[in-house]
Amino acid sequence: MKLAFSSNAFKKFSLEQCIPLISQIGYSGIEILCDVPHAYPPKDLDVIKIRSLLSEHNLEISNLNSFTLYAIRDTYHPSWVEDISSLRHIRFEHTKNCIELARRLGCKFVSTEGGGPLLKKSYQSLRRRFKKEMNALSRYAEDQGIKVLIEPEPGLLLESSRDFLSFIKGIESEYIRLNFDIAHFYCAREDPAEMVHRLSDFIEHFHLSDIATSRIHNHLIPGEGSIDFKSVFRAIVEFGYKGHVTVELYPYQNNPVFAGARAFEFLRGLLLEI
């Protein structure tokens, strides 16, 4: 298991600026935000320049994060389950562009939101809408050799392991998989360590942050909340995962280097104990 850090904590920096900073902390990987001010629009990113910087600073790309769309509206919108088809199309095309960027960058994964916020529609009708979009997207993902990772989150159409497992049964492709956010499952009042085993057939990448005992969805520096990371890491090791666990601390925009360093120190110590 390797540690990466998400560039979404560095929104006051350019992507070119945060690459060396993340490397200097000690991380071996970076998750690239596919939104302003980093890889947006995805088609406009200077791939040659970014690949050169990554090589210079010995960083791998853990994942392309296409979850938020502040460039167009906000964290969740346009979502996969909008009533207006043209808005769903914006999300679809953005994710396709991120898949293409992943191929050009040599990254294997693009993560996306778990459907979107619930609307005044029946739950099943929103599920059917999301399923249709994912099955259509999967054909492009397969052509490009990139896996799209759904990320369940509190308050979205998919927020728990039960939601994900029920939904994935209707997906026709192995190129739609899971971005396992440890904090999100904890917020859903599930044991993340148990969920690693339960969802192991679908996991391709992990997000990591801590959460307070209240289980309110507010990302904290690992070690400052109540998640038992030792048990989660043991489960990940038992599962045989060799990829990156990406620390995601976007609330720390004012001091991402401090937050990243504190997280790295804490997590590195835990890994030495496993």
Predicted segment positions?
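Residue-level detector of anion-binding/catalytic polar loops
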Residues: 28-29, 60, 108, 147, ...
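Short, small-residue-enriched loops and turns at beta-alpha junctions
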Residues: 38-40, 68-69, 117-119, 154-158, ...
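Glycine-rich, proline-tolerant flexible connector loops at the mouths of alpha/beta enzymes
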Residues: 32-55, 114-118
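Histidine-acidic metal/acid-base catalytic patches
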Residues: 1-7, 11-26, 48-55, 106, ...
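Conserved radical SAM core fold
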Residues: 34-38, 70, 117-119, 210-217
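Active-site acidic/histidine proton-transfer and metal-coordination neighborhood
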Residues: 16-17, 56, 73-177, 189
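Glycine-rich, aromatic-flanked loop segments that form ligand/cofactor-binding clefts
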Residues: 54-68
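Conserved beta-strand positions in the central sheet of alpha/beta enzyme cores
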Residues: 31, 63-65, 111, 204-207, ...
